[in-house]
Amino acid sequence: MKLLIDAGNSRVKWALYQGEDCVRQGAAEHGELAGLAAVWRDLPLTGAWMSSVARREVADALAAAVPCPLHRVHAERRFGDVRNHYRNTAEQGADRWLAVLAARELCRGDVIVACAGTALTVEALTAEGDYLGGLILPGHGLMLQSLAQGTANLNRPAGEVVDFPQGTQDALASGAIAALAGAIAEQRRRLAERTGRAPATVILTGGDAARIAPWLAAPMQIVDNLVLMGLLKVANT
């Protein structure tokens, strides 16, 4: 069996695969990693594959908890028919690359891949397999947190998302969603301009995917655990 680990900025997701079948999965906050070694210790593992954008001490703790050979996955210049045009793949988060590889399996046309977690990443992938790069911006929670910490009067709960906010709490909620949905829409527009084709499908993943989806006027799929899907693709080669 193969253990796949996606170590994000705030949480760790993992899944156990027998062939193409997911037989077990779980998640933990960074402060809850101690229990994972006990969970994984008795599993009949043949190997483990990890993508990490977490702090080094988190990645090291996960590596120590894995009771079998561990493969740390990084972004590459090419995988299959996907070509990575990132200037320096060594500085690119593996999670972004793996999400693109998974999206390629789901959609063979032009696609925008949006991962909505602690940060929002918005990637552009053409039907020809050219991964053009993408955006990184603060996620929903981080955006509101930065306003609370960086201003004198905005440390308050966000309200409702409305078209024309007439109160500060609604303005916070609406502004955050407008920024996130707007970034996705703008990359979709840019990709259509680049290719000369119809605007792309959006594949949306991450903890805030459902929060953003209602505000996107685009054909879309919400896909859970997209990074783990990409890890499985790499592990099976």
UniProtKB/Swiss-Prot annotation:
It is an enzyme of class 2 (transferase). SUPFAM superfamilies: Actin-like ATPase domain. Coiled coil: none annotated. CDD domains: ASKHA_NBD_PanK-III. Its EC number is 2.7.1.33. Pathway: Cofactor biosynthesis; coenzyme A biosynthesis; CoA from (R)-pantothenate: step 1/5. GO terms for biological process: coenzyme A biosynthetic process. GO terms for molecular function: ATP binding; pantothenate kinase activity. It is found in: Cytoplasm. Gene3D superfamilies: 3.30.420.40. Pfam families: Pan_kinase. Homodimer. Belongs to the type III pantothenate kinase family. This is Type III pantothenate kinase. It comes from Chromobacterium violaceum (strain ATCC 12472 / DSM 30191 / JCM 1249 / CCUG 213 / NBRC 12614 / NCIMB 9131 / NCTC 9757 / MK).
